[in-house]
Amino acid sequence: MPMKVAEVLELLAADGWYRSRTRGSHRQYRHPTKHGTVTVAGKPADTLHPKTLTSILRQAGLKDPR
């Protein structure tokens, strides 16, 4: 089942990611100890494509909670 952008943002925040910058609907997140950035695009009510969700979770080093 696809996830909403808001649910992904909650997962990132729970793991310690913080928003570093925004341009339009693209939010970029950084982590104090993990390397790299994670970009999440779309409005909070939008549904993410399954491959986009997989990519975001892989970049963040998280497992799919479902």
Language model regions located:
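Polyanion-binding surface elements
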Residues: 1-16
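Secondary-structure boundary/capping motif
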Residues: 4, 21, 48-49
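Short secondary-structure junctions
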Residues: 16-21, 64
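C-terminal structural segments of small proteins and small subunits
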Residues: 35-37, 41-66
